[in-house]
Design a protein with these regions (language model features):
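Alpha-helical segment proximal to the catalytic Tyr-Lys
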Residues: 124, 167-172, 229
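Active-site helix of classical SDR
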Residues: 119, 155, 163
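Residue(s) in the substrate-gating loop at a strand-loop-helix junction
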Residues: 139
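C-terminal helical subdomain
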Residues: 178, 199-227, 231, 238-240
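Short C-terminal tail/terminal secondary-structure segment
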Residues: 144, 232-250
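Active-site loop immediately N-terminal to the catalytic Tyr-X3-Lys motif
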Residues: 97, 144-150, 208, 226
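Substrate-binding pocket helix/loop in short-chain dehydrogenase/reductase
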Residues: 95-96, 103-105, 201
Length: 250
């Protein structure tokens, strides 16, 4: 894709799942890539799998001081950050009536406050430089109701509206978009769903399957490229047709 060669890319939650696939895709496009992830074992694994990474960083995205320190390290390593993939997130499958205050606070701290901390830190850097692209991982959960993920759903709705507001305020210097995947076969998804549950979900998706992380990564690469230079403020659904009919067959 045009314009990705030599871009400097930071991917949060970049050591597994969608983040790892996205890091790999940008490397294929000739970009310099740093990944940020809390999971030490996952960081070691991604370093082995992607030896051309510019660096791996450890930070809790819900801690502003750690975010600022990690971002400064990314700038030091790569000489700047042109593209942020704001992807770090967690989910907990539980009934609404069973959500504890601690669980609620944890999911919001990572999925919304953490997204804000990373986005604001990157935006200040990009605004000063005069250009940049911020792409955030939302979810179809942010636009549709799903049981057992009330806290996660609320955070992803927040990411969608945060993205729109950022795009309006940061234009014309910085483009901001979000990708809202549907069901994606990631380690996080695997940990929460049995094979029977996965098959049941597949029957309700028009394309009859989960997305691959690489398919989400491809959209991130396009949106960061010069081919998408007129795209900002948009949320791109990548869900196999799931939201077209509101998962009508369920």
């Amino acid at each position: 894709m045009r314009g990705l060669e030599d871009k400097r890319v930071l991917v949060t939650g970049g050591a597994s799942g969608i983040g790892a696939a996205t890091a790999a895709r940008f490397l294929e496009e000739g970009s310099a890539v740093c990944v940020l992830d809390r999971d030490a074992a996952a960081r070691q694994r991604i370093q082995r799998e992607l030896p051309n990474l510019a660096g791996t960083l450890d930070a809790d995205v819900s801690n502003l001081q750690q975010v600022e320190s990690a971002f400064a390290n990314a700038v030091r390593i790569m000489g700047g950050v042109d593209v942020l993939i704001n992807n770090a997130g967690i989910s907990i499958r539980h009934k609404f009536l069973d959500i504890t205050p601690e669980e609620w606070a944890k999911v919001l701290a990572v999925n919304l406050t953490g997204v804000f901390f990373v986005a604001q830190t990157a935006a200040r850097h990009m605004w000063q430089r005069g250009s940049g692209v911020i792409l955030q991982t939302a979810s179809t959960n942010g636009v549709m109701g799903y049981p057992f993920y009330a806290d996660y759903n609320a955070t992803k709705a927040g990411v969608i509206e945060l993205t729109k507001s950022m795009a309006l305020e940061l234009a014309p210097k910085v483009r901001v978009c979000a990708v809202a995947p549907g069901y994606v076969l990631t380690p996080m998804q695997r940990a929460e769903y049995t094979d029977e549950m996965l098959e049941e979900v597949n029957r309700k998706i028009p394309l009859r399957r989960h997305a691959k992380p690489e398919e989400i990564a491809a959209l991130f690469a396009y949106l960061a490229s010069d081919d998408a230079a007129y795209a900002t403020g948009h949320v791109f659904m990548l869900d196999g047709g799931e939201t077209a009919g509101g998962l009508a067959s369920r």
